[in-house]
């Protein structure tokens, strides 16, 4: 008798065949079998495993003709499917006599069965000793088919591979066994007694059909062990491993033993219904038939089948050992599998396990609504995906919340009254897609999910312009073209460079801060693609602004900063000849390079601006810098729709927490479409590592996305999974295309993660343990992308390894070279003060005729222009002043700017209410009373009298109600165009502190930190006039505290002419340093604060001013014994008081330039008063504010022989700039004057 109890079951033939090969030639057998086969003995194994059974009665000596089979002993009634129950007798009836086989006919071919074929005979004969019965159940397969399509479509776009029907059915079988453990038992005789053995684990046997080299087929059954402990993904992995090793001949003895229940799927070859043989040692074998429509519908068309709601069926059979399993159990077991395959919970678990980012297809009854009704619902569904599809997109590479975005009611077909039965029905979708008028719901969903729910989530329906919506819709819904192999290799090369660079720095410079890009490496191929697309359009430059994270990587792999220079900065090996000022850390520095296309012939300039650690502070600076470059190129007017005008592209990188949290982001976005500020669209890339320093998103923003603020300007938003570099590249190119088509901002939100802490010394797991449990075990994007390319056959493993080794080799070579460079010891930083000196003899006076021409311009309104009746007198007065003198402050300012325009300078003037002026003093732009047509007089100065251009421009803009972004923009403009005259005016000087970060980080220290020069002018209305603490002070003390190394010029001129010369000197001296001017308010209409024409045509800026009586020789300096030093509009109050009191013993000296303090001029002026004994500094500001906190220290050092005892006259020290009461203000002001002249 066959050895039916062999531990290898029906695989015993294979083991014996291997043993024979091993015995003849051990090397012909896989080494994993050697230990088992070295002492294997088929005979002893058979004897040892032969079960102790009661021998059957002897067969007759001669075969009897057609003997009837023995009847079973009496027992319980038939159960389950009607199969008789096993007889309770332990002694089976005698086997019937076998009839002899008829002899072969003449011509028949005889073949002795050996090896596998003989083993099959043996196994099948042995199986006859197992009394079996079979249950059969037809199961709807439509849900199985549809969900498998969904799963495999998703896998195809991710890691590759497929889920088979057998994977799903096998897993369902294992889950059903948990509910029916008896199906996992098997029968065994022990010492002549029947036993039911319940194994500790479910070991699922897979019947695998193998084809040998000779073309013959053989069947092996290999087991997946302990599969009841596996989740679906683990089960699939184990399944694929068994099948792969079977195909490769790598199965081991362990794989063949211990199978407790088997699954066979003859349906793959079209078998609809099978009753497989059950081998000893198992309780059941489950057969899977082919999926077919019911026979009566197999001739129907697809359309008719869909219309009727007919689905395919799959037949499951359970052939079981009837001695230990009853028909009812088997039937319930199949029913459970049936129910499971239709259950929401079963599919939810599988979709979660495979990280499918949306809900499975649900089993629901067909909805009998009319096609007309459903057509409308299809349109609703399409609109829902366009609006909400991003909520179901698979954009989080960490998948920290696997259920958060898997569903939205609007995206559920059931919400729209549709079911799986509608998937294959055709509906009218005319106009919805660029394609046929009618489409199956399945195809509609495929387009919608491919477009909106894969690795890119798109938000664009908030855009108000239909043309832009339509353009985006057509682009994203079009079928994506797969990158070529060459393009894929190029993307991989950028990932190699990004990761290897970080790994290299981490290895070589352990513990040094660098704010690595690890976890977000896809931003490198993304930026590369965007710049490449800009080059494809033939644009002039891409200017990048970004925070410190990833900055070194961008410098190296995007801008092209030499590795040697970066490594030298890590070494601290700075070249003294390149030192400038105090410097800054390496991850704040900028650079410039040239980008050369890999797959094209164009190149483009690329630059990265310097930035501080103040997140997002660089945003408006970048925009201003780009606008300046665009204006310099003069490709067209930037305030029009001229495409060529925007040939310089700003690319701005952000962090997710900063983009949502920093108010300057909203301020900067608000500039996007404003005249005077628009740059034709910015490419925003958010490196969304889903965490602030340690703060999780739920604590850092109230919105769903960090990008929601960008909806305010109608910018399209693309959320993209950073683990899919191809998607990142596609989005980057699309973003540039949109920018070029519509000259608008585009937002790319690349979700990724931060491999390390905020910096390399930080441990993020202390505050974000769950996230970093995932991060610590996550494979990097380079590895996962490499595996995907190898898996798809696009590249070989060797090609991938060679490319990485080549890049690592380059880094190692440069590193060794840097280590050999001459090392320079650290030295104290040098001041930059001496780098720029005002040229001697600089003339700022102008010819009288130019003043007259500017005055005439204000009355040269166009024909038919209606000037407002309150403005007309102002214009007429200006012409009068230009010819007769007594020029006031506002006109002196316009004379300065107009003269610069006439001399070929670009003048840009902006601020809140700047065109008219906060105090209705400027009227630089005249508005027609009826038509709102605008007339700008100073623009007439852009041409000479003969009509030829001067080369100058006058650009004046009302800014948005913003300080931070507005000041940053103007600073950036001066960096981009150093020759421009750029002025920003605060509404009141008090409000400039809204831009304090720009002042601290850029204006006052940009030169010392980065060598970045600026000549921006800040005009800050300042003065105590009883208007309260928020309309009084431009905070002189703060600017003086920031001043050092000649970093700025700070002035508070007291005459219109001195202001005129100050502005002209600043524009013409060739020095690139900011100018801070504290301008007047009430003094704008002070009849004493005027200047004569000769003050504009004969002199220049004077940093120290005496009273005119002394300058004219009327006053006697020898009578003076008290000198009152002062600055600003209080001078006029002091002069009036002096005249009233007839105090010839008191002289008033004005310090017009507060910093740098004019030491020589001040010394010369004071020396003219030989009898002066008392020196006072008089200011309106409180004692702890204004110029005194600095001057109280600096004046005694300047002139110790005269000013060592200088005293202060001012308001008391105050926490606010002034009193809120105008009456208290008047008392305090009088007290200052009384003390000064007391």
Curated annotation (Swiss-Prot):
Q: Which organism is it from?
A: Mycobacterium ulcerans (strain Agy99)
Look up the EC number in the record and give it.
Answer: 2.2.1.5, 4.1.1.71, 1.2.4.2, 2.3.1.61
Q: Return one GO MF term.
A: 2-hydroxy-3-oxoadipate synthase activity
How it assembles, according to the record, is:
Homodimer. The 2-oxoglutarate dehydrogenase (ODH) complex contains multiple copies of three enzymatic components: 2-oxoglutarate dehydrogenase (E1), dihydrolipoamide succinyltransferase (E2) and lipoamide dehydrogenase (E3).
| UniProt superkingdom | Bacteria
Q: Which GO terms describe its cellular component?
A: cytosol; oxoglutarate dehydrogenase complex
Residues binding acetyl-CoA are 1049, 1065, 1100, 1103, 1153, 1160-1161
User: Where do the record's region annotations for Succinyltransferase E2 lie?
Assistant: 95-343
Q: What is this protein called?
A: Multifunctional 2-oxoglutarate metabolism enzyme
Question: Corresponding gene?
Answer: kgd
Q: Where, by residue number, is the active site?
A: 322
Q: What's in the keyword line of the UniProt record?
A: Acyltransferase, Allosteric enzyme, Coiled coil, Decarboxylase, Lyase, Magnesium, Metal-binding, Multifunctional enzyme, Oxidoreductase, Thiamine pyrophosphate, Transferase, Tricarboxylic acid cycle
Residues of the region (2-oxoglutarate dehydrogenase E1, C-terminal part) are 344-1238
The free-text function statement in the UniProt record for this protein reads: Shows three enzymatic activities that share a first common step, the attack of thiamine-PP on 2-oxoglutarate (alpha-ketoglutarate, KG), leading to the formation of an enamine-thiamine-PP intermediate upon decarboxylation. Thus, displays KGD activity, catalyzing the decarboxylation from five-carbon 2-oxoglutarate to four-carbon succinate semialdehyde (SSA).
């Amino acid at each position: 008798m066959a050895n039916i109890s062999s531990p290898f079951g029906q695989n015993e033939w294979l083991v014996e065949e291997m043993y024979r090969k091993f015995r003849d030639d051990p090397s012909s057998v896989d080494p994993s079998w050697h230990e088992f086969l070295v002492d294997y003995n088929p005979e002893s194994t058979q004897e040892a495993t032969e079960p102790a059974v009661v021998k059957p009665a002897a067969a007759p000596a001669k075969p009897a003709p057609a003997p009837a089979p023995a009847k079973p002993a009496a027992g319980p009634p038939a159960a389950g499917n009607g199969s008789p129950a096993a007889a309770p007798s332990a002694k089976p009836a005698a086997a019937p006599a076998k009839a002899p086989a008829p002899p072969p006919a003449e011509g028949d071919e005889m073949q002795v069965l050996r090896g596998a074929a003989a083993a099959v005979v043996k196994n099948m004969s042995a199986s006859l000793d197992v009394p079996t019965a079979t249950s059969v159940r037809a199961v709807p397969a439509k849900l199985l088919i549809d969900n498998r399509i969904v799963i495999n479509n998703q896998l195809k776009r991710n890691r590759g591979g497929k889920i088979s029907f057998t994977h799903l059915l096998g897993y369902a079988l294992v889950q059903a066994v948990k509910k029916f453990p008896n199906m996992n038992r098997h029968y065994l005789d022990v010492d002549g007694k029947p036993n039911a053995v319940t194994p500790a684990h479910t070991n699922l046997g897979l019947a695998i059909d193998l084809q040998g080299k000779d073309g013959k087929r053989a069947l092996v059954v290999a087991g997946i062990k302990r599969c009841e402990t596996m989740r679906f993904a683990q089960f699939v992995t184990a399944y694929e491993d068994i099948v792969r090793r079977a195909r490769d001949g790598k199965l081991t003895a362990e794989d063949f033993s211990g199978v407790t229940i088997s699954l066979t799927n003859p349906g793959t070859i079209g078998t609809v219904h099978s009753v497989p043989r059950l081998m000893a040692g198992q309780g059941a074998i489950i057969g899977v038939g082919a999926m077919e429509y019911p026979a009566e519908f197999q001739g129907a068309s697809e359309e008719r089948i869909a219309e009727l709601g007919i689905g395919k069926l799959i037949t499951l059979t359970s052939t079981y050992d009837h001695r230990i399993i009853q028909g009812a159990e088997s039937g319930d077991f199949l029913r459970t599998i049936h129910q499971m395959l239709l259950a929401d919970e079963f599919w939810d678990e599988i979709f979660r396990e495979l990280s499918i980012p949306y809900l499975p297809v649900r089993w629901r009854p067909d909805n009998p609504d009319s096609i007309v009704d459903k057509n409308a619902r299809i349109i609703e569904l399409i609109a829902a995906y366009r609006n909400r599809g991003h909520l179901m997109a698979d954009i989080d590479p960490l998948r920290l919340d696997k259920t958060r975005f898997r569903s939205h009611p609007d995206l559920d077909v059931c919400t729209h009254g549709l079911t799986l039965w509608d998937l294959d029905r055709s509906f009218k979708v005319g106009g919805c897609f660029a394609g046929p008028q009618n489409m199956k719901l399945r195809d509609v969903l495929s387009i919608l999910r491919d477009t909106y729910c894969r690795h890119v989530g798109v938000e664009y329906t908030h855009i108000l312009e239909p043309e832009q919506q339509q353009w985006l819709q057509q682009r994203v819904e079009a079928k994506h073209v797969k990158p070529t192999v060459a393009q894929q290799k190029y993307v991989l090369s950028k990932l190699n460079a990004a990761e290897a660079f970080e790994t290299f720095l981490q290895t070589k410079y352990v513990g040094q801060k660098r704010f690595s890009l690890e976890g977000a490496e896809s931003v490198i191929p993304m930026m590369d693609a965007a710049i490449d697309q800009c080059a494809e359009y033939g644009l002039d430059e891409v200017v990048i602004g970004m925070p410190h994270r990833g900055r070194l990587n961008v410098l190296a792999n995007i801008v092209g900063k030499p590795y040697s220079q970066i490594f030298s900065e890590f070494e601290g090996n700075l070249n003294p000849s390149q030192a400038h000022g105090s410097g800054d850390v390496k991850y704040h520095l900028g650079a410039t390079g040239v980008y050369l296309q890999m797959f094209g012939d164009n190149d483009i300039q690329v630059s990265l601006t310097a930035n501080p650690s103040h997140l997002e502070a660089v945003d408006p600076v970048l925009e201003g810098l780009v606008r300046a470059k665009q204006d310099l190129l003069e490709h067209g007017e930037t305030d029009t729709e001229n495409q060529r005008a925007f040939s310089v592209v700003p690319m701005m990188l952000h962090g997710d927490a900063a983009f949502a949290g920093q108010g300057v982001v909203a301020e900067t976005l608000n500039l996007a479409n404003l005249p005077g500020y628009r740059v034709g669209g910015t490419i925003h890339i958010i490196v969304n590592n889903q965490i602030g320093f340690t703060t999780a998103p739920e604590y850092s923003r109230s919105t769903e996305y960090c990008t929601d603020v960008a909806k305010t300007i109608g910018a399209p938003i693309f959320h993209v999974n950073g683990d899919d570099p191809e998607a990142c590249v596609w989005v980057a190119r699309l973003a540039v295309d949109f920018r070029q088509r519509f000259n608008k901002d585009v937002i790319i939100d690349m979700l990724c993660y931060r491999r390390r802490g905020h910096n390399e010394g930080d441990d993020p797991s202390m505050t974000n343990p769950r996230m970093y449990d995932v991060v610590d075990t996550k494979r990097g994007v380079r590895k996962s992308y490499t595996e995907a390319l190898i898996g798809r056959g696009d590249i070989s493993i060797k090609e991938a390894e060679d490319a990485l080794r080549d890049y690592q080799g380059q880094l190692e070579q440069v590193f060794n070279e840097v280590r050999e460079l001459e090392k320079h010891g650290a030295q104290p930083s040098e001041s930059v003060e001496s780098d720029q000196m005002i040229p001697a003899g600089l003339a700022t006076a102008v010819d009288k005729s130019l003043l007259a021409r500017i005055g005439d311009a204000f009355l040269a309104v166009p024909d038919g222009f209606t000037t407002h009746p309150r403005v007309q007198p102002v214009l007429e007065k200006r012409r009068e002043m230009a010819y007769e003198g007594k020029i006031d402050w506002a006109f002196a300012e316009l004379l300065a700017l107009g003269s610069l325009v006439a001399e070929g300078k670009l003048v840009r003037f902006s601020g809140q209410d700047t065109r008219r002026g906060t105090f209705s003093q400027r009227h630089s732009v005249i508005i027609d009373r009826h038509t709102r047509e605008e007339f700008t007089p100073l623009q007439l100065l852009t041409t000479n009298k003969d009509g030829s251009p001067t080369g100058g421009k006058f650009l004046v803009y009302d800014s948005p109600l913003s300080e931070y972004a507005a000041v940053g923009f103007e600073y950036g403009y001066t960096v981009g165009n150093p020759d421009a005259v750029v002025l920003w005016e605060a509404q009141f000087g008090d409000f400039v502190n809204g831009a304090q970060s720009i002042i601290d980080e850029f204006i006052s220290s940009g030169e010392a930190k980065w060598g970045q020069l600026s000549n921006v002018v800040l005009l800050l209305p300042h003065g105590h006039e009883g208007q309260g603490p928020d309309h009084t002070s431009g905070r002189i003390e703060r600017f003086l505290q920031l001043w050092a190394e000649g970093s700025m010029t700070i002035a508070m001129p007291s005459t219109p002419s001195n202001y005129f010369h100050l502005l002209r000197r600043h524009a013409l001296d060739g020095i690139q340093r900011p100018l801070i001017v504290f301008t007047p308010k009430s003094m704008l209409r002070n009849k004493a604060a005027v200047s004569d024409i000769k003050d504009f045509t004969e002199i220049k800026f004077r940093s120290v001013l005496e009273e005119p009586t002394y300058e004219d020789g009327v006053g006697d300096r020898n009578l003076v014994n008290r000198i009152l030093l002062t600055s600003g509009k209080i001078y006029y109050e002091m002069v009036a008081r002096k005249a009233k009191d007839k105090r010839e013993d008191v002289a008033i000296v004005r310090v017009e330039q507060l910093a740098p303090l004019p030491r020589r001029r001040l010394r010369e002026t004071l020396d003219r008063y030989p009898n002066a004994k008392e020196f006072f500094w008089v200011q309106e500001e409180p004692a702890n504010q204004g110029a005194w906190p600095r001057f109280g220290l600096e004046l005694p050092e300047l002139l110790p022989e005269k000013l060592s005892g200088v005293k202060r006259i001012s308001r008391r020290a105050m926490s606010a700039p002034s009193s809120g009461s105008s009456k208290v203000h008047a008392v305090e002001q009088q007290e200052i004057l009384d003390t000064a002249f007391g």
